[in-house]
Amino acid sequence: MTFVRELEVASQNSRAFNVTLWFIFIFGLLKLVPFALRFLSMVFDLFVLPPVNYAKYGCKAGDYAVVTGASDGIGKEFASQLASKGFNLVLISRTESKLVALKDELEGKFNIKAKILAIDISADSKDNYNKIYSLCDDLPISILVNNVGQSHSIPVPFLATEEEEMRNIITINNTATLMITQIIAPIIIRTVKKHRESGDKKLKSQRGLILTMGSFGGLIPTPLLATYSGSKAFLQNWSSSLAGELAADNVDVELVLSYLVTSAMSKVRRTSMMIPNPRTFVKSTLRNIGRRCGAQDRYGTITPFWSHAIYHFVIEELFGVYARVVNEINYKFHKSIRIRAVRKAVREAKQN
């Protein structure tokens, strides 16, 4: 007698068996349907929906976008691509010469206005924050990009992390991000309200936007990058909470999650299917603002680059970001990076 035939006989002779089968079917349906809907939503976000129209954020109204960490890498790309959409810019970074060069380039190329401020954010200086306020308070600002960030120089055990590095990571990734947002967000709210009440039909649906750069290091607990991982995980809850607070003020708040991107901070130089360059990553981010992409279960969060989104989705759905196996794989990955970095440092020391 075949297995199917045995099921048929059991079904005919046992009501309890039938009830059990229906329970299994309904339970499976309740699990599979949401999974399928989340997967289809991700695919739709990434590959079907058209790019976001930035007119709703004031690109045609002469509004400004503030970009921190603007002189290199991802921050520089945010500045360039926002300028290409018509936004004026406030560029904040450490190196004045780079800011001047970028200002001249973008003003000449895109016929926009750019203001610059060279400050060392790691100093956590009240004077720095006053300078930001003085520069920005009178400007019509509709976008803030919290891009400035710092990681460890190489993967390192928490107990071996130098105090200065630990303090700098927390100051730059957390304290400065909160302080700058507390300065700029009221200006964004004011700008949006003024546009919406102006009577101009083109501005009646005006919105503001606050983007904060997150990381898979904050999504997934990351041994050997413990301080950095914790600082980015903090941004997840803070940004999502802020999204709820500012929704009534017509300000969209998004945490942008990325895996590896070629940059000075990641120390990765070669692009691949999993590792885009800053231009490609920022293009994906600006294209998909307001959509979850790979972060289907996370409010106010976006994993915009397609391979990062799929990777995020698989980890969340199959294992969970806090699973032991994910933690162990992450530890082995960063341990191998640390070993190579230490060997390289030893070789360079011998050569010198």
Curated annotation (Swiss-Prot):
Q: What Gene Ontology molecular-function terms does this entry list?
A: ketoreductase activity; very-long-chain 3-oxoacyl-CoA reductase activity
Membrane-spanning residues where?
A: 20-40
Q: What are the BP-aspect GO terms?
A: fatty acid elongation; sphingolipid biosynthetic process; very long-chain fatty acid biosynthetic process
Q: Which residues bind NADP(+)?
A: V66, D120, N147, Y228, K232, V261, S263
Q: Which UniProt keywords apply?
A: Endoplasmic reticulum, Fatty acid biosynthesis, Fatty acid metabolism, Lipid biosynthesis, Lipid metabolism, Membrane, NADP, Oxidoreductase, Transmembrane, Transmembrane helix
Protein's cellular compartments = Endoplasmic reticulum membrane
Please state the pathway this protein functions in, per its UniProt record.
Lipid metabolism; fatty acid biosynthesis
User: Has keyword Signal?
Assistant: no
The catalytic residues are Y228, K232
Q: EC number(s) on record? A: 1.1.1.330
Write out the GO cellular component annotations: endoplasmic reticulum membrane
CDD domains found in the cross-reference section: 17beta-HSD1_like_SDR_c
Q: Which cysteines are joined by disulfide bonds?
A: none
Look up and give the membrane topology term.
Answer: Single-pass membrane protein
Reactions mediated catalytically: a very-long-chain (3R)-3-hydroxyacyl-CoA + NADP(+) = a very-long-chain 3-oxoacyl-CoA + NADPH + H(+)
Question: Family per UniProt?
Answer: Belongs to the short-chain dehydrogenases/reductases (SDR) family.
Annotated function: Component of the microsomal membrane bound fatty acid elongation system, which produces the 26-carbon very long-chain fatty acids (VLCFA) from palmitate. Catalyzes the reduction of the 3-ketoacyl-CoA intermediate that is formed in each cycle of fatty acid elongation. VLCFAs serve as precursors for ceramide and sphingolipids.
**Protein's recorded name:** Very-long-chain 3-oxoacyl-CoA reductase
Q: Which organism is it from?
A: Candida glabrata (strain ATCC 2001 / BCRC 20586 / JCM 3761 / NBRC 0622 / NRRL Y-65 / CBS 138)
